[in-house]
Amino acid sequence: MISFERNRAVAEQVCDLTGGDLIWYSESAFSDAFEYDAIIAIMSCGIAVRKIAPLLSSKWTDPAVVVVDCALRHAIALVGGHHGANEIATQLSVLGADPVITNASEVVK
């Protein structure tokens, strides 16, 4: 998980739930985190999109990416919905976040 230190309380809640590692945001945070199977980013979608765009190569090998706002209102499955992001976004509903899932195969069920 990647978070700004100002969102420490939310980051700790998410870490406690998921058991993931916490990486404080830095210029290299996303490239460092791309070795993981999934990344939860506690920040705006805009920041996450700009940081992951140059790192993406294949839907089959890229990590799942979920973006969570700092108020835990929304958990957005941004990349890799079928490779873990949808499941993680749904898991975060335990903390009150509404999962945002946009895969056509999931939406039309």
Model-derived segments and their meaning:
Residues 50, 86-90, 94:
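Residues on a specific face of well-ordered alpha-helices
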Residues 68-79, 95-109:
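Internal, active-site/partner-interface "lid" segment
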Residues 11-15, 53, 89:
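Short amphipathic alpha-helical segments and helix-helix/interface helices
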Residues 6-7, 44-48, 105-106:
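Short glycine-rich anion-binding loops that position phosphate/pyrophosphate groups of nucleotides
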Residues 21-26, 41-43, 67-68, 98-103:
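General beta-strand structural signal in soluble alpha/beta enzymes
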Residues 28-84:
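Glycine/small-residue-rich interface belts in oligomeric ring/scaffold proteins
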Residues 1-26:
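N-terminal basic/disordered segments at the start of proteins
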